[in-house]
Amino acid sequence: MKPDRGQVAKWLGAPTDQVGSVNDPRTAEDHGVKWNEMWVYKLPELGFDRVVLWNRYDLLGVWRVFPGGRTEPEKLPEA
Protein backbone atom coordinates (compact mmCIF):
# COMPACT_ATOMS: atom_id res chain seq x y z
CA MET A 1 0.00 0.00 0.00
CA LYS A 2 1.37 3.41 -0.96
CA PRO A 3 1.80 6.02 1.77
CA ASP A 4 -0.76 8.80 1.97
CA ARG A 5 -0.10 12.54 1.99
CA GLY A 6 0.10 12.72 5.78
CA GLN A 7 2.64 9.91 5.98
CA VAL A 8 4.84 11.46 3.28
CA ALA A 9 4.70 14.84 5.04
CA LYS A 10 5.64 13.16 8.32
CA TRP A 11 8.64 11.40 6.75
CA LEU A 12 9.91 14.28 4.61
CA GLY A 13 8.60 17.36 6.40
CA ALA A 14 7.02 20.38 4.79
CA PRO A 15 8.04 21.00 1.18
CA THR A 16 10.06 24.07 0.23
CA ASP A 17 7.65 24.77 -2.62
CA GLN A 18 4.52 23.35 -4.21
CA VAL A 19 3.38 23.37 -7.84
CA GLY A 20 -0.28 22.73 -8.66
CA SER A 21 -2.80 21.46 -6.15
CA VAL A 22 -4.82 18.39 -5.28
CA ASN A 23 -7.90 20.04 -6.80
CA ASP A 24 -6.20 21.41 -9.92
CA PRO A 25 -7.67 19.70 -13.00
CA ARG A 26 -4.61 20.58 -15.11
CA THR A 27 -1.89 17.96 -15.35
CA ALA A 28 1.77 17.99 -16.31
CA GLU A 29 4.12 15.14 -17.13
CA ASP A 30 7.55 14.52 -15.61
CA HIS A 31 9.55 11.37 -14.89
CA GLY A 32 7.12 9.39 -17.06
CA VAL A 33 4.01 10.15 -14.98
CA LYS A 34 1.12 12.61 -15.25
CA TRP A 35 0.65 14.66 -12.09
CA ASN A 36 -1.37 17.61 -10.86
CA GLU A 37 0.61 18.43 -7.71
CA MET A 38 4.36 18.50 -7.07
CA TRP A 39 6.04 18.95 -3.72
CA VAL A 40 9.56 20.37 -4.09
CA TYR A 41 12.26 20.01 -1.43
CA LYS A 42 15.39 22.13 -1.94
CA LEU A 43 18.20 20.18 -0.28
CA PRO A 44 21.54 21.81 -1.22
CA GLU A 45 23.21 20.30 1.86
CA LEU A 46 22.51 16.81 0.44
CA GLY A 47 23.61 17.66 -3.10
CA PHE A 48 20.18 17.09 -4.66
CA ASP A 49 16.61 18.32 -4.60
CA ARG A 50 13.64 16.03 -4.09
CA VAL A 51 10.29 16.08 -5.89
CA VAL A 52 7.17 14.22 -4.83
CA LEU A 53 4.49 13.84 -7.50
CA TRP A 54 0.79 13.34 -6.80
CA ASN A 55 -2.31 12.79 -8.89
CA ARG A 56 -5.03 14.00 -6.55
CA TYR A 57 -4.50 11.91 -3.41
CA ASP A 58 -2.45 9.17 -5.09
CA LEU A 59 1.32 9.16 -4.64
CA LEU A 60 3.00 8.67 -8.01
CA GLY A 61 6.59 8.66 -6.84
CA VAL A 62 9.55 10.45 -5.32
CA TRP A 63 12.66 11.48 -7.25
CA ARG A 64 16.04 12.96 -6.42
CA VAL A 65 17.03 15.70 -8.86
CA PHE A 66 20.76 16.33 -9.11
CA PRO A 67 22.59 19.38 -10.47
CA GLY A 68 22.70 19.06 -14.25
CA GLY A 69 19.26 17.45 -14.36
CA ARG A 70 20.03 13.78 -13.65
CA THR A 71 17.20 12.12 -11.71
CA GLU A 72 16.77 8.88 -9.83
CA PRO A 73 13.72 7.38 -8.15
CA GLU A 74 13.77 7.35 -4.37
CA LYS A 75 12.12 4.70 -2.23
CA LEU A 76 10.02 5.64 0.78
CA PRO A 77 9.20 3.32 3.66
CA GLU A 78 6.09 1.21 3.14
CA ALA A 79 2.93 2.53 4.76
Predicted regions and their residues:
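Residues within mature, well-folded domains
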Residues: 1-79
